[in-house]
UniProtKB/Swiss-Prot annotation:
One of its GO terms (molecular function) is acyltransferase activity, transferring groups other than amino-acyl groups. It holds the Pfam family PanZ. The lineage of its organism: Bacteria, Pseudomonadati, Pseudomonadota, Gammaproteobacteria, Enterobacterales. It comes from Salmonella typhimurium (strain LT2 / SGSC1412 / ATCC 700720). InterPro entries: Acyl_CoA_acyltransferase, GNAT_dom, PanZ, PanZ_GNAT. Residues 1-127 form the N-acetyltransferase domain. This is PanD regulatory factor. Disruption phenotype: Deletion results in a pantothenate auxotrophy. Deletion mutant accumulates pro-PanD. Belongs to the PanZ/PanM family. It comes from the Bacteria.
Amino acid sequence: MKLTILRLEHFSAQDQIDLGKIWPEYSASSLSVDETHRIYAARFNERLLGAVRVTLSGTQGALDSLRVREITRRRGVGQYLVEEVIRDNPNVSSWWMADVGVEDRSVMAAFMQALGFTAQHDGWEKR
């Protein structure tokens, strides 16, 4: 099976289980989506391996809660996920990722830099 990045508009029972493993701090009811607030996920073998929340406002986009399940980290899932989010939103010219909740800032800084983001005092920016 191929790794697929998709925008989640509805959550299956399995999606809810997988999102609970990705984001144990969020309840299913807090994961509402619309045109401004989106969730993108990486799916492999019908299971979600990673996800990111996206908030859009005109030409600005904010990423938060980017997380890949521990067992599948360091295999390019997060990079592919962010690249596809950016590609899926061509009208967004400025992206922001806050460092709130980042588990290891040095690892995340290297990851974001590899994606073309520049470090700011409280996160990363890509224009």
